[in-house]
Amino acid sequence: MSENSHIKVIVGMSGGVDSSVSAYLLKQQGYQVEGLFMKNWEEDDNDEYCAAADDLKDAQAVCDKLGIELHTVNFAAEYWDNVFEYFLAEYKAGRTPNPDIMCNKEIKFKAFLEFAAQALGADFIATGHYVRRELRDDKYVMCRGLDDNKDQSYFLYTLSHEHIGQTLFPVGDIAKPEVRRIAEEQDLITHDKKDSTGICFIGERKFKDFLQKFLPAQPGVIEDTDGNNVGEHEGLMYHTLGQRKGLLIGGMKEGSGEPWYVVDKDLERNVLIVGQGKDHPRLYSNGLNANQLHWVDRIGPKGTTRCTVKTRYRQEDLSCTLLVGEDGMARVLFDEPQKAVTPGQSAVFYAEDVCLGGGIIDSVIK
């Protein structure tokens, strides 16, 4: 009998290949494995309802194949209160939030963790995230996933060492192609299912159409960097820094004749500011200020620290100097100017392969 046979692990089953293989691997390792499918969104149209129903069907098929029980739970109320309302408030304030990070914090590693422990008697939970956990100096740290292309530590920086200690990440030290190969070898229905992309509650819908249902758009003018009126926008919330498509001013050939890009937003005047050329100087910043800091070890760096930072997912690590102030703000100075650093997104800090934590970008330093 396996030494793990008395340890109960509840796997978050999404209906995707990563959680499917996670459940399979844990079963192979002798754990007592059960699945839990979370419903986080009350669908408002048939397409989204079908997508969620398909995911549940796939999760059930995988659990049946593996011979494990699948539980379901509805966290739609928690999701609305803690993730969706934050998402809307950030857009209303002119920032560009990352709801996946908030979902991990409030749902997967709070509501799910508590439900699994209290209602299902879990010793551990497990997810299909591409990160690794290691015990260093009596504390768990979160390391990047072995597959650089799939590493998801950026989305999990709000976890603490206690969360990591209670969670298993079975695919964290496996490359994605190998995960798919295992799924195919085991004849799991999800082996060739495409990875989900975009914001889960929007799905395949047009972002603009979705947002319009919840936030009234405030049209305004588009100005170039010299203050000239060059067009009109339908709402600042539809635009992000560095954006080229959807500006509806493509026919203008003024200035250099290069394409127009969003370089700034003037929230007070409700003005979208654009410049020509993908490397327009206004797109670059020398650093950033971040708030709502969270450190995995719950202590964090003190004073001035050399480390690396990511200001968006899949970005290469940027060398920087990090200064954490007494006021709970982080001031980050890049070694080289960086493009399209966006308030509302997260800045996540690393010491080599270890994710230290991060915060929300409040403003940029020009």
From Swiss-Prot:
ATP binds at residues 12-19, 38, 128. InterPro entries: MnmA-like, MnmA-like_C, MnmA-like_central, MnmA-like_central_sf, Rossmann-like_a/b/a_fold. Gene3D superfamilies: Adenine nucleotide alpha hydrolases-like domains, HUPs, Translation factors. The keyword Iron does not apply. Keywords: ATP-binding, Cytoplasm, Disulfide bond, Nucleotide-binding, RNA-binding, Transferase, tRNA processing, tRNA-binding. The active site is at 103 (nucleophile), 200 (cysteine persulfide intermediate). It catalyses: S-sulfanyl-L-cysteinyl-[protein] + uridine(34) in tRNA + AH2 + ATP = 2-thiouridine(34) in tRNA + L-cysteinyl-[protein] + A + AMP + diphosphate + H(+). Its EC number is 2.8.1.13. This is tRNA-specific 2-thiouridylase MnmA. Catalyzes the 2-thiolation of uridine at the wobble position (U34) of tRNA, leading to the formation of s(2)U34. Belongs to the MnmA/TRMU family. The record marks 129, 345 as: Interaction with tRNA. It is found in: Cytoplasm. The gene is mnmA.
